Amino acid sequence: MNRNAISLFSSSGIGDLGLKANNINTVIACELLKGRMDLFHCNYPTTKCFQGDIWKLKNSIIDYYRTTYNEPPFLILATPPCQGMSSNGMGKMLSDYRKGLRPKMDERNRLIIPAIDIIQALQPEWVILENVSNMVNTLIYDENNILTNIIDYIKTSLGDNYFGNPVVVDAVDYGVPQHRKRLITVLT
């Protein structure tokens, strides 16, 4: 059985440790920042690494997977940047907006769009999305420049192909000695 995964917004691969512990092989990773991608590659030397802007790399990721593997991935893990969604990030963003230093909408929140494009193209059996709990309240402009809730965008884009709902979990409930609330969405 194919137990291949694709990791989007991979950072150094911390999220992929859980996949590895469950015999799921991350075969492709994508990360914007070179230092993080280099560290990911050290941690997972056999993984094909795509470093750079996911908007520019999404077709290369899709093409590479399709030409290398003859079946859909088992799982896609996507952990897009949270700065525009977190309460700390929002406070700084709104402060900078009031000072005229940045636009009101954080473009990083739209990075879910190329991730969804990859999911739609490759049709994995499972999808895991992880982010801050405030993701449920985040608005983005979709491809048609229509303002929409990011969770509604995900559900509408994936349609009837996937079932699942976002759930807020707190790390303290899983043995971690601190409160750290995250929004986890598992789709199948």
Language model features: what each stretch is:
Residues N4, N23-N25, P45, E71-P72, ...:
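Short loop/turn motifs at secondary-structure junctions
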Residues A5-K56:
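SAM cofactor-binding core of SAM-dependent methyltransferases
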Residues G15, L57-D63, P72:
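Conserved N-terminal glycine/acidic-rich loop preference
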Residues G18, L39, N43, S60, ...:
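A generic secondary-structure signal
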Residues A29, Q51, L77, I128-L129:
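Generic enzyme active-site microenvironment
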Residues G52-L57, V169-D173:
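Conserved SAM/SAH-binding loop
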